């Protein structure tokens, strides 16, 4: 799990950056307060870039709080979970 504090919170800039890095299946997602995703994996490398709110992400190595402007890169097949208490909006992308 790699986290970068980019300071970028503009959706359009985030999407263009991910496109330039070869990510596809790029979309915007928002979760309401109290949303929880149990342990799961993704087949491909994944990115989650928060532009509003905050989310807690956990792996077998621990957990982190992602806030506005934070980018999380997850290698393919990384077992993880996520929850938000306040609500969050982020840009998602995948790379094969």
Regions of interest found by a model, annotated:
Residues 60-77:
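Short acidic-glycine-tyrosine-enriched beta hairpin
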Residues 76-96:
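Ligand-binding loop in jelly-roll beta-barrel domains
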Residues 17, 36-42, 58, 83-84:
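Short histidine-centered beta-strand/loop micro-motifs
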